[in-house]
A protein has these predicted regions:
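Catalytic core of the metallo-beta-lactamase
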Residues: 8-9
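Active-site beta-strand/loop architecture of penicillin-binding DD-peptidases
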Residues: 12
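Conserved phosphate/anionic-ligand binding catalytic regions in large, soluble enzymes, centered on
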Residues: 17-31, 116
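Catalytic adenosine-cofactor/nucleotide-binding cores of aminoacyl-tRNA synthetases and other
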Residues: 30-383
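Short, small-residue-biased leader/transition segments that mark boundaries at the very start
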Residues: 2-3
Length: 383
């Protein structure tokens, strides 16, 4: 009905006409001086009425020409995403997400908080194109557009997301107790004009827990202790380069009463500091990232992933709530290199080896940094 005797929340009882959408759509477009009204394919059958009503309004002098034009295209469907406002509202109302700006939500505020840039979204739209036939765009295309945009922009930094302490047992003997060694790295490897960043190497560092294996699998080139071989001989612990720093050789580890490794021990190989003469004389296959214990910045890092585990969560009458990904968010207490202490809300960085991260627009504060994972360095979903 277009006539309904009911109080309106804005105009009260002054106006009692509630036009149907089909009737209101062309009039509102004309009043707002819309030139191109872009609709999905289900509105194609309504275009004759849309044009007819605008023609009548023009004939009566109530509408300035030229009138709006309606165009219909297929909906842009992205795998692992739902765009139904009703279903998105249900996710918010039932607490499955933290709000409309939750970084897992496909809303503008959600994507922005996740670290998506206007340029990345424009690139994604250009690559997706327009069509009259329905289809699906893989979520990896959206992430790929973001990676391509951020690769040129984002400063680099080292971060340890699952930390375990590394102790260089011969550091004091080689360099003196309490001594620190400054290491440098480019802010951006492809833009030397953006300068260098500096951090401290010392006796105690943080490394990723996964960079140590007590019994290494085949092809593991990171840290492991001396190994006893089948013939009874001993294979020395593995050597790796600490990126931008020195080569070290693993000597063992310390465990707690439950048998969990809580500390990795290694010895520094002298004269192997990156950028110094002879540094490459010792060849290693593994390079790992690290953060110095003395100047590390502790931070909350929110590791976001796809909200749904099913590529088509609401297709064919499915209950989309049953397709929610239980691992779409995990929170880590991480250690970051000192350059990130100055990060402002909304700043984006590439955490080396991990991916692209953005300082959260709501919760990131001086002295309490919070970073959201935007995307990995490559598409690894389901791999």
């Amino acid at each position: 009905d277009v006539y309904k005797r009911q109080t309106h929340h804005n105009t009260g009882d002054q106006w009692c006409i509630y036009p149907m959408y089909t009737f209101a759509h062309p009039i509102e477009d004309a009043l707002e001086q819309i030139t191109h009204s872009i609709c999905t394919l289900e509105f194609e059958d309504q275009r004759p009425f849309y044009d007819w009503l605008l023609e009548r309004l023009a004939e009566s002098g109530l509408l300035q020409t030229p009138p709006p034009r309606q165009y219909e295209f297929a909906r842009l469907n992205v795998t692992y995403v739902i765009t139904s406002k009703r279903k998105l509202k249900q996710l918010v109302d039932e607490g499955h997400v933290a709000g409309w700006d939750d970084p897992r939500m496909p809303t503008i505020v959600g994507l922005r908080r996740r670290g998506y840039t206007p340029q990345a979204l424009q690139l994604f739209a250009e690559r997706s194109g327009i069509s009259k036939s329905g289809g699906w765009i893989d979520y990896s295309s959206l992430e790929g557009a973001l990676r391509e945009d951020l690769d040129e922009k984002a400063p680099r930094a080292m971060a340890v997301l699952d930390p375990i302490k590394l102790v260089i047992t011969n550091w004091d003997a080689l360099h003196g107790e309490g001594t620190l060694d400054s290491c440098t790295a480019p802010v951006h490897p492809h833009h030397p004009e953006r300068g260098q960043r500096t951090f401290q190497f010392g006796r105690e560092l943080w490394i990723e827990r996964t960079d140590y294996e007590e019994t290494p699998p085949k092809g593991f080139f990171r840290l492991y202790p001396p190994q006893t071989l089948a013939d009874g001989s001993t294979k020395p612990g593995n050597r790796v380069r600490l990126k931008y720093g020195h080569v070290i050789q693993c000597t063992g580890a310390v465990k707690n009463i439950d048998g969990e490794v809580i500390e990795v021990h290694a010895e520094l190989v002298p004269d192997t500091k990156s950028g110094t003469p002879g540094a490459d004389s010792v060849k290693v296959k593994g390079v790992i990232t690290w953060v110095g214990l003395t100047d590390a910045v502790e931070a909350e890092v929110r590791l976001y992933d796809r909200l749904f585990a099913d590529p088509h969560p609401d297709a064919g009458g499915k209950n989309f709530l049953e397709a929610l990904n239980p691992d779409s968010l995990s929170v880590a207490t991480a250690y970051l290199e000192p350059s990130l202490a100055q990060a402002q809300a909304g700043d984006t960085f590439q955490f080396e080896r991990h991916g692209y991260f953005v300082a959260d627009r709501e919760d990131h504060k001086p002295g309490r940094p919070v970073f959201n994972k935007s995307t990995g360095l490559r598409d690894s979903w389901g791999k």
